[in-house]
């Protein structure tokens, strides 16, 4: 290849064929752009002398993680939300609620701060670093605890733990002793408190918010999360987001997808089925204040306890049912079982 020809980038990793690794300038033009090409419109600078072809999509979250990860020196790794995303955490989008991009945290020393990255020079055992699909990242426990410690609020920290568990990256009973073993780190009190509120079976961040409104704002006993409900003949009726077994009250968060005509019809049919079994429901939608939702939950629970509806439902699972409420249960599934049993979950 001549020095005047832009090299054709190979895919970064067999499992990441859609990604392109940043390249250093190469005077020969074989392994990267020549100095002249790098200054032209066909290459984009990613930082510290690295470049990718200009057609590479910088908004793709995994590409952004890769570009920032290329800045690592010979030690350390990507951590926090970016590591969790790279390890398979589908809910870690790298975008704030206002649509702006979160910086990628790099657990290393001897790296200058710049736009797009947050250097973290905390003590790091080399055993806590792994290479996953060609990129050095901190292991899931470390990455989860990091993001929980630096989360903007306690509720955000709970969401981190729950969504890491959603993707079966961490077991909550391992997260607690891990946090205890790192008591001197910034943000550990918040992380420890968040673990106490966390659950392995939440299916979306907004479900977590509704559960925290239920327990923290309304001050009610903690509901079960995504627990299947059956009639007394063992037929599966539905799996509500939240379920107060004592009161016979369930909670659901309805996002935008629930406004679709067919989806809304299915929701109404299921609500009717729950009602006929003696369950009362509370629905939360986007834009409601915490106090509004909490008041409605309290009122529904009080009404249900007063009415003492007949219990034509149960959470006792029939022998044929395969439980998926815990990370351990989901990890034990075959790929075919995961595709079949977990298809209803979001992300």
Residue locations for each model-derived region?
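Short gly/ser-rich loop at a beta-strand->alpha-helix junction or flexible surface loop bordering the NTP-binding
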Residues: 1-186, 305-347
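Surface segments flanking catalytic/ligand-binding clefts of nucleic-acid enzymes
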Residues: 2-4, 25-30, 165-166, 170-347
């Amino acid at each position: 290849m001549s020095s005047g020809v832009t090299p054709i980038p190979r895919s970064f990793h067999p499992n990441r064929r859609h990604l392109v690794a940043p390249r250093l300038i190469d005077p020969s033009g074989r392994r990267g752009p020549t100095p002249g090409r790098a200054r032209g419109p066909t290459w984009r600078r990613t930082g510290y002398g690295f470049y990718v072809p200009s057609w590479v999509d910088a908004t793709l979250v995994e590409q952004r993680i890769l570009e920032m990860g290329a800045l690592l020196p010979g030690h350390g790794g990507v951590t926090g939300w970016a590591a969790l995303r790279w390890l398979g955490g589908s809910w870690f989008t790298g975008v704030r609620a206002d649509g702006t991009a979160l910086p990628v945290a790099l657990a290393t020393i001897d790296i200058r701060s710049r736009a797009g990255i947050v250097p973290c020079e905390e003590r790091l055992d080399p055993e806590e670093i792994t290479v996953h699909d060609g990129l050095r990242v901190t292991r899931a426990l470390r990455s989860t605890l990091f993001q929980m410690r630096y989360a903007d609020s306690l509720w955000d920290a709970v969401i981190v733990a729950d969504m890491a568990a959603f993707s079966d990256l961490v077991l909550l009973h391992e997260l607690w002793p891990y946090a205890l073993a790192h008591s001197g780190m910034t943000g550990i009190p918040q992380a420890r408190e968040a673990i106490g509120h966390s659950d392995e079976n939440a299916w979306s961040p907004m479900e977590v918010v509704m559960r925290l409104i239920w327990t923290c704002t309304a001050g009610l006993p903690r509901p079960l999360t995504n627990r299947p409900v059956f009639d007394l003949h063992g037929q599966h009726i539905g799996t509500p987001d939240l379920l107060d077994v004592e009161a016979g009250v369930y909670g659901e968060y309805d996002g935008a997808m629930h406004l679709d005509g067919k989806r809304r019809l299915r929701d109404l049919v299921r609500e009717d089925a729950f009602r006929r079994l003696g369950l009362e429901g509370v629905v939360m939608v986007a834009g409601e204040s915490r106090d509004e939702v909490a008041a409605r939950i309290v009122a529904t629970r009080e009404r249900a306890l007063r009415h003492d509806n007949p219990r034509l439902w149960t959470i006792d699972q029939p022998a044929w049912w395969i439980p998926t409420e815990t990370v351990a249960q989901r990890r034990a599934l075959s790929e075919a079982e995961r595709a079949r049993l977990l298809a209803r979950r979001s992300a």
